[in-house]
Amino acid sequence: MLKDLVKQCRSYRRFYQDTAIPYNELADMVDTARLAASASNAQALKFKILCTPEECADIFPYIAWAGALKDWDGPEEGERPSAYIVIACDLAIGKNKQWDDGITAQTIMLAAAEKGYG
């Protein structure tokens, strides 16, 4: 079953912007990620869910898209994400926790795939 979820996880560059993801589903994805392993069990990562059209529009200019496609500014209006989960490291709790963000991001992606997103 886990293998099937991993197979579902892909990099997406276009989304269904008009399909809202309920806040409670996003919060459940974050809660799942919160249970993932972290260096020294420090749990230094913090999360912010953005899921209103205004919040998504505000953050969009700051998102880097597709590192290999240098001339692409990201998805067009109508193809942008309808929600974001921002992950930040609380440096007061722990430094050099950069590997935790990858574990956490994949856990969120797996939780999203399990819910049928992606």
Language model features with spans:
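Small-aliphatic-rich amphipathic alpha-helix that forms the alpha element of a beta-alpha
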Residues: 29, 33, 85, 91-118
